[in-house]
């Protein structure tokens, strides 16, 4: 279009100790929330909300994962709020172009570190659980899917809100199987953090699912070899895990406090990137502020 467009820049002085930037998502994973509503919900006498912008993408009901797999409303890729993992990083929308620079510009994650410094980079997932001297990857977080993969360990935390983990019966009905599973409910010894060793105590074990999760707790679920691995723990045992996220092209592992993913990296040092025209979706205009 040849019409004039106006761009307004909202500037925040993060050297002021009273100013912060926080990621925000609905109180129940899979539910969506307008930014103006989140603004009001998070505003209080000691926590004033002064601006917001919608910057992530979530799975919609017309996509296969949303339509068939109980993932409608769940973010397409990673989220972190105040050091607490919301959802794991995925390969969503990766692979536009073969050149190194093309790939580096696929997805733009906005990350705020513990020094309140902003970064826009691609990030990769590297989470692990250790029981004794054995370890296994944590493949997903808070993706309460009805079609879980075999031979994996997945995690859920209180960002599930009012929703319980899906029951074994629901999963078996969706997949047409009778596959054993196990869930460990664990209590964290410290606050959530990214790229740091976290410890937790196993407080209960079930094989049916349907677990609701309070703040300070997490559920570890396994099927196949994931089930066999989790079965090595018993109530009262101490387990260790690390929610690993690293900058995809340097390997750096910053102290991530906030993280959210837009669709693509559209501008770098004042210049438009190739992602403005190598995917049609990015030519459209979407107002995102609140």
Feature names for model-found ranges:
Residues 244-257:
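Short, Lys/Arg- and Gly-enriched loop/turn segments at beta-strand edges
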Residues 289-290:
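C-terminal soluble interaction/assembly domains
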Residues 284-285:
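Periplasmic peptidoglycan-binding/anchoring modules of Gram-negative envelope and division proteins
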Residues 255-281:
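Short peripheral tails and domain-boundary helices/loops at the edges of structured domains
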Residues 233-240:
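Loop/turn positions that initiate beta-strands
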Residues 218-232:
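Short alpha-helix capping/helix-loop boundary micro-motifs
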Residues 102, 212, 232, 256-258:
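Low-complexity, polar/charged sequence tracts that form flexible coils or short amphipathic helices
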Residues 1-219:
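Zymogen propeptides
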């Amino acid at each position: 279009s040849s019409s004039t467009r106006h761009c307004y820049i909202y500037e925040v002085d993060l050297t002021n100790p009273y100013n912060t930037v926080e990621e925000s998502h609905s109180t129940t994973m899979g539910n969506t929330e307008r930014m103006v509503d989140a603004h009001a919900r998070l505003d209080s006498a000691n926590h004033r909300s002064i601006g917001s912008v919608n910057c992530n993408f979530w799975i919609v009901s017309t996509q296969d994962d949303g339509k068939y797999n109980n993932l409608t409303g769940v973010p397409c890729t990673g989220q972190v709020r105040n050091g607490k993992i919301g959802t794991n990083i995925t390969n969503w929308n990766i692979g536009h172009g073969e050149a190194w620079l093309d790939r580096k510009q696929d997805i733009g994650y906005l990350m705020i570190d513990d020094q309140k410094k902003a970064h826009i980079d691609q990030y990769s997932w590297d989470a692990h659980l250790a029981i004794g001297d054995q370890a296994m990857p944590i493949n997903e977080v808070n993706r309460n899917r009805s079609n879980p993969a075999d031979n994996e360990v997945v995690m859920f935390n209180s960002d599930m809100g009012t929703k319980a983990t899906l029951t074994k019966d629901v999963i078996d009905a969706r997949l047409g199987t009778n596959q054993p599973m196990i869930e460990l409910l664990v209590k964290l010894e410290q606050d959530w953090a990214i790229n740091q060793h976290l410890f937790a105590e196993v407080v209960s074990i079930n094989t049916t699912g349907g677990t609701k999760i309070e703040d300070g707790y997490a559920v570890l679920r396994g099927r196949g070899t994931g089930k066999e691995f989790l079965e090595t723990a018993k109530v009262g045992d101490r387990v260790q895990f690390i929610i690993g996220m690293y900058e995809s092209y340097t390997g750096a592992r910053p102290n991530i406090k906030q993280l959210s993913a837009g669709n693509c990296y559209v501008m770098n040092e004042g210049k438009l990137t190739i992602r403005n025209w190598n995917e049609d979706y990015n030519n459209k205009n979407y107002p995102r502020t609140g």
